[in-house]
């Protein structure tokens, strides 16, 4: 496994985004928190793939690919892969709705303080698990 400059840049971007999530939450931008938390998790997992020498596909949830390459994963990620995969899938499901909404789904009305706090918790958890791998 290697670390590369782009993967480390992804880690730095994720750290900034996590701080931004807290600001967005304080401002009541709950749907924005959900959307940005998904992007944070996505970039973290793509950073791990880079460290493993795997080209990240242009999709938003790479948890299946991580499972397919479980033999290459470092122990901390392997031990937490179920949790990381669940977080990635859950946030991915909300990605577009949190940003664009729909005629019957207004993001600023649908996402709550609790949804926002949960999204922050998920992003922080993935950061905690994968940051030692990328550094």
Task: Name each model-derived stretch.
Residues 1-135:
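Terminal alpha-helical segments
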């Amino acid at each position: 496994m290697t670390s590369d400059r782009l993967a480390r840049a992804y880690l730095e971007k994720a750290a900034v985004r996590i701080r931004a999530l807290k600001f967005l939450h304080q401002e009541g931008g709950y749907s924005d928190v959900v959307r940005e938390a998904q992007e944070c998790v996505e970039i973290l997992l793509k950073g791990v793939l880079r460290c493993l020498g795997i080209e990240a596909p242009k999709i938003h949830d790479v948890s299946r690919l991580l499972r397919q390459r479980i033999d290459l994963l470092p122990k901390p990620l392997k031990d937490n892969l179920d949790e990381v995969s669940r977080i990635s899938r859950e946030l991915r499901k909300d990605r577009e709705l949190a940003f664009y909404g729909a005629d019957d789904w207004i993001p600023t009305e649908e996402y709550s303080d609790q949804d926002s706090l949960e999204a922050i918790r998920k992003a922080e958890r993935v950061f905690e698990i994968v940051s030692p791998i990328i550094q």
